[in-house]
A protein has these predicted regions:
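A short, charged/proline- and glycine-enriched loop
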Residues: 1-7, 33-35
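Terminal low-complexity segments of carbohydrate-biosynthetic enzymes
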Residues: 10-13, 20, 24, 38, ...
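Short, acidic, metal-binding catalytic loop of nucleotide-sugar glycosyltransferases
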Residues: 23-35, 55-60
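Short beta-strand-to-loop acidic/aromatic patch adjacent to the donor-nucleotide binding site
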Residues: 115-129
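Conserved nucleotide-sugar donor-binding
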Residues: 271-290
Length: 471
């Protein structure tokens, strides 16, 4: 695989801040001797693009920097509409690539067809936080981490050659994976539910454990990810739990705890229920399935299902990165919790009805039904959190008490006043819309892969080379 077939992509909706991400990863790649095309995929509006694109041009990089924003995306979609020549399909195409978590990532898949793609979100950084005195891992333990107070002692930044770690495994059969990789069926997180990856409860320390099982030597590593520190996979509910537990914390937007890695080692597995598209790499040589085109935070769940078919494997590579949680353009905590609860419901429903897995798509039979029991289970959980929040406000000092009461009020409003019928009605509407969009659009995906593969090799896809300064 030649270097010009390796892409580093940064999906973002925060063009204002992405320049710092670009420069840090670019410098990291230079220090490790890599030359790679960097592409920013921007979900901003035209007005935000006009306002903040000049800041991207002020960056200084060693590598060539490219940009795919609202204008380039419109050109891309216009080309697809022209090739398909069917007005009835235009809505499905727009759904696949609409501004959303999954829609923006689907552009990255098209633009990197035929190569290897390494992706990092705009709030990731090319270093990790590790404990100063790493402990040995237990047998079958792949990673251990813990929450500690931010700004304290006992941990330092460490950097690993990220691209080399991905290149060691992506697109290779398991038999060619380096010998230091552990091998097994799946990784189990001691702090999360296996199939939804949602936190079971706030855990101040967790481990990833390897479950031994069959893994074919000729299975190809199609996706991989680094480990990560900072916030790891902390759910919105976990942030609230940390806020409730820390009586010195005045605001939910403050982060007094940070996730630090104690130790880790690489592993290759048959399944991956911990898919983390924020720090992932993909073998996109022959195309991959689309991310779910949704504004809910489960766009990568399709990959956790897709990888279960024969001949495919996943890896946690020998590197780690850090997540610097940004509150800029982030939904309020109550909205994030609602997003996660709906996502977890959809994960369970879709997973239980999968009917087909193939090279580029999946199929499932779930049609979007939401029972009264489904809705009540969510309401019971959130109502308990609401009550605990109000109780905590009673004995808190004024600033913290105000923050707790505001959060409780937002929680009640977001969950439709905890009124069961009203909540179920709106939950059904949201779920039905998401499922309809997903099912309709992914059926078209293989055709679009074929169209884009031809055009990319013939004339390229619309993108702008950023006129920034070279180091």
């Amino acid at each position: 695989m030649s270097e010009n077939e390796l892409y580093f992509v940064i999906p973002t909706c925060r063009l204002r801040d992405v320049g710092e991400t670009v420069e840090q990863y670019d410098e990291h790649f230079r220090r490790n001797g890599h030359t790679v095309r960097i592409i920013v995929f921007d979900d901003s509006s035209h007005s935000s693009q006009a306002k903040y694109y000049p800041q991207l041009e002020q960056t200084k990089t060693h590598n060539d920097l490219y940009y795919v924003g609202p204008r380039e995306k419109e050109q891309f979609l216009a080309y697809l509409h022209k090739r398909l020549r069917d007005k009835r399909l235009e809505r499905l195409v727009k759904d696949l690539f609409r501004p959303s978590y999954g829609g923006n990532r689907n552009f990255t898949l098209m633009y990197t067809l035929g190569g290897l793609m390494v992706s990092a979100d705009d709030d990731m950084r090319p270093y990790t936080l590790m404990e100063d005195s790493p402990e040995s891992l237990d047998a079958d333990e792949i990673c251990r981490g813990k929450l500690i107070k931010a700004g304290g002692n006992g941990y330092t930044r460490k950097s690993f050659d990220i691209l080399r770690a991905f290149l060691d495994v992506l697109g290779k059969p398991v038999r060619q994976v380096p010998d230091n990789y552990e091998r097994g069926e799946v990784l189990l997180d001691s702090a999360t539910d296996l199939e939804t990856n949602a936190s079971v409860k706030l855990a101040h320390e967790n481990s990833l454990l390897l479950r031994r099982g069959p893994l074919a030597d000729d299975a190809t590593v199609k996706m991989a990810q680094t480990f990560r520190s900072g916030t790891n996979d902390i759910d919105a509910l976990d942030f609230v739990e940390m806020f409730l537990a820390d009586e010195s914390q005045k605001s939910l937007s403050d982060l007094n705890d940070v996730y630090v890695l104690v130790n880790f080692r690489p592993a290759v597995t048959k399944m991956n229920w911990r898919m983390d598209c924020g720090v992932a790499g993909y073998d996109n040589t022959f195309g991959l399935p689309p991310f779910f085109p949704t504004r809910l935070r489960f766009e990568d769940y399709i990959y956790r299902l897709w990888i279960q078919q024969p001949g495919i494997a996943a890896a946690h590579v020998d590197a780690a990165q850090n997540h610097c949680k940004s509150n800029y353009m982030r939904n309020p905590p109550a909205a994030e919790i609602f997003n996660e609860e709906v996502s977890n419901l959809l994960k369970r429903k879709i997973k239980s009805t999968v009917s087909r897995l193939d090279e580029l798509t999946i199929a499932f039979d779930y049609e979007g039904e939401v029972t009264a029991e489904d809705a009540q289970e969510i309401l019971d959980k959130i109502s308990r959190l609401h009550a605990r929040t109000l109780d905590a406000a009673k004995g808190a000092e004024p600033v913290r008490a105000d923050a707790l009461r505001v959060f409780a009020a937002n929680l009640e409003k977001t969950f439709y006043g905890f009124e069961p019928d009203f909540f179920q009605q709106n939950l059904l509407r949201i779920v039905d819309d998401v499922v309809s969009v997903i099912k309709g659009s992914i059926e078209l995906w293989p055709t679009l892969i074929e169209v884009c593969y031809f055009q990319k090799n013939r004339a390229g896809l619309p993108q702008t080379k950023v006129n920034n300064q070279k180091k």
